[in-house]
Design a protein with these regions (language model features):
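ATP/NTP phosphate-donor binding region
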Residues: 1-65
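Active-site histidine-anchored catalytic micro-motif
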Residues: 46-59, 63-114
Length: 114
């Protein structure tokens, strides 16, 4: 993988210095970072409004399978989005080779894809 598409479907980053430093290191290794703006998005305790985070998830169906999708952090909040996720479209993208990874709160999304 030479490109990582970041998503932030759960909690906001408490300290953006660490993820920004990680992104700089990845760039220095030749990895292209997409959607880096999600790192600094904040709405209350979440990484954006429910609408922003849901749109970001549903756009995964359009991401090239040549890219790795990585959730920035877990925390709390993805459960609010689960009923409105376009599961069929995202599952089709995964069948086409899209890889998605995350941890913690993001596990609820991963379980929904089973």
């Amino acid at each position: 993988m030479k490109a990582i598409h970041l998503i932030a479907p759960s909690g906001a980053s408490l300290d953006v210095k660490s993820p920004l430093a990680g992104m700089e290191w990845l760039k220095s290794q030749g990895v292209q970072i997409e959607n880096a703006a999600c790192v600094e998005r904040v709405s209350e305790r979440f990484a954006g409004s429910d609408q922003e985070r849901l749109a970001e998830l549903n756009q995964l169906a359009q991401i090239s399978p040549q890219k790795l999708v990585m959730a920035m952090r877990g925390g709390y909040g993805i459960h609010r989005l689960l009923p409105d996720i376009d599961w069929a479209a995202i599952a089709k993208a995964i069948q086409g080779g899209l890889q998605i990874c995350g941890h913690s709160d993001f596990t609820a999304f991963e379980m929904g894809l089973l």
